[in-house]
Amino acid sequence: MDYINAALLGVIEGITEFLPISSTGHLIIAEQWLGHRSDMFNIVIQAGAILAVTIIYWRRLLDLVLGWREPENRDYAAKLIVAFLITAILGLVVKKLGFELPETATPIAWALIIGGIWMIFAEWAAARKAPHKEITWLVAILVGIAQIVAGVFPGTSRSGATIFVAMLAGTGNRAAATEFAFLVGIPTMYAASGYELLKTFKDGGAAGEDWTALAIAFIVSTIVAFIAVKWLLAYIRSNRFTLFAIYRIILGVLLLGMATSGLIA
């Protein structure tokens, strides 16, 4: 893989990983022109995006750790832990059962379309309720489950699934729902990436990798994800997610058309 392609894939990952539009759907299209991505490459560019969100929320994370004696912080941290543990336990069960859908265009396209419709419904439902900021135990449990659903069905979007489950379950405030979804995503994605990284090294999948290309992709992904998430957090203060939903539906229809015409697998 040449360095320009590595940088472009880093840009795509950085933009799409935490926006509710599915990084998988975009990367599968990019793969047609930029070449196949190795497992190691996927892990590295995702790690860059996770690092960006960790940097953005480092003060909030530090506050939760240092301020654990405060009831509000302790309660919030406990809900983050429960959501993470639900994802971890169910994730291990899914792995053991070997249930996994192929990352091919048609199922991803349908996940994009259905997810877009789901987002529109969630926005409509949330608008009919008071914009509560509270993260309830129900929200924490459902967010944990939503992360697994997103992992099992490529194209769902982890951020999209968790944000809109939180909104439907009672956290009508977009900023509060997004923050919880992103904070849960940090340990979840670090754990998943760490597991996949160890597995890749164990299987010899890191042999022959171009480490310069990996470094470029990682750095680009980190920088672009930082900018994208900062923009998203500012955007949702006064805007709905409807544009993202429409974009998902259009992209899903486009992918279906490409799959039907044989332009993409």
Swiss-Prot record:
Biological process according to GO: cell wall organization; peptidoglycan biosynthetic process; regulation of cell shape; response to antibiotic
Q: What else is known?
A: Bacitracin is thought to be involved in the inhibition of peptidoglycan synthesis by sequestering undecaprenyl diphosphate, thereby reducing the pool of lipid carrier available.
| Taxonomy, superkingdom | Bacteria
Q: Transmembrane segments in this chain: where?
A: 38-58, 80-100, 107-127, 135-155, 175-195, 213-233, 244-264
Q: Which UniProt keywords apply?
A: Antibiotic resistance, Cell inner membrane, Cell membrane, Cell shape, Cell wall biogenesis/degradation, Hydrolase, Membrane, Peptidoglycan synthesis, Transmembrane, Transmembrane helix
Q: What is its main location?
A: membrane
| Protein name, as recorded | Undecaprenyl-diphosphatase
| Keyword Transcription regulation listed | no
What cellular component terms from Gene Ontology apply here?
Answer: plasma membrane
**Which GO terms of the molecular function aspect are on file?**
undecaprenyl-diphosphatase activity
Task: Give the E.C. number(s).
Answer: 3.6.1.27
InterPro entries according to UniProt: UppP
The family this protein is said to belong to: Belongs to the UppP family.
Function summary: Catalyzes the dephosphorylation of undecaprenyl diphosphate (UPP). Confers resistance to bacitracin.
Swiss-Prot/TrEMBL catalytic activity:
di-trans,octa-cis-undecaprenyl diphosphate + H2O = di-trans,octa-cis-undecaprenyl phosphate + phosphate + H(+)
Q: Does the keyword Protein biosynthesis apply?
A: no
Gene for this protein? uppP
Source organism per entry reads: Rhizobium etli (strain CIAT 652)
Q: What class of enzyme is it?
A: hydrolase
Topology versus the membrane: Multi-pass membrane protein
Where in the cell does this protein reside? Answer: Cell inner membrane
UniProt cross-references to PANTHER family, sorted A to Z: UNDECAPRENYL-DIPHOSPHATASE
